[in-house]
Amino acid sequence: YGPWINENSLWANLNHPVVRDYFDTYFREAIFALKDHPAVYGWDVFNESHHRTDDEWTTRKYQEWLREKYGTIEKLNKEWYRRYESFAQVRPEKRRASYSIWSSLLPAVEYEKFRAESLTEICRFLYNTAKKYDYIHPIMIDGTSAMILVDDLTLRNCDEFETAYVPDIYGATFYPKSWGKNFKDTPWTLSMYFSIPAG
């Protein structure tokens, strides 16, 4: 926790169009250089997929998401108990301010829903970009196991049920000796988690 909690959680902002151009170039060069090597089974395009940031690119994406969901700022104001004049005034970094959550939890809830959908879209972009250069090898994405490992889902928010439909292989991240959670008394927890890709 701390003042950095909503800063970009990765080394590059996956919502920035220039970064996406770089990903396209990188995938093209790496895949063309390696795809015929016999040791290549497939491509893991996003390990421990998560994305947490309140930067301007993501904020604009969020404002557009709200516009598509609510249609008018008047409808959003009615649902959220707010008085915005335009979607451009909605700032996600204010969503958990005390005045905000006392009047309505929707700003915080909606932003987490947006973040989950945005991450799935990012994963779809990475999958499609890699598949464009290699349609033979399987493409893998894996989640963070956040829903069974952390108490605050906002740290690594994702919708693994939806994201699991994107790649050819959906994997999981779990370190049994980490975080003091080995689930020896509740083995069904991991069973449920690993059944996510099956739907």
Residues covered by each model-derived region:
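Ligand-binding pocket scaffold of soluble enzyme catalytic domains
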Residues: 189-192
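Polysaccharide-binding and catalytic clefts of secreted carbohydrate-active enzymes
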Residues: 2-161, 165-169, 173-183, 187
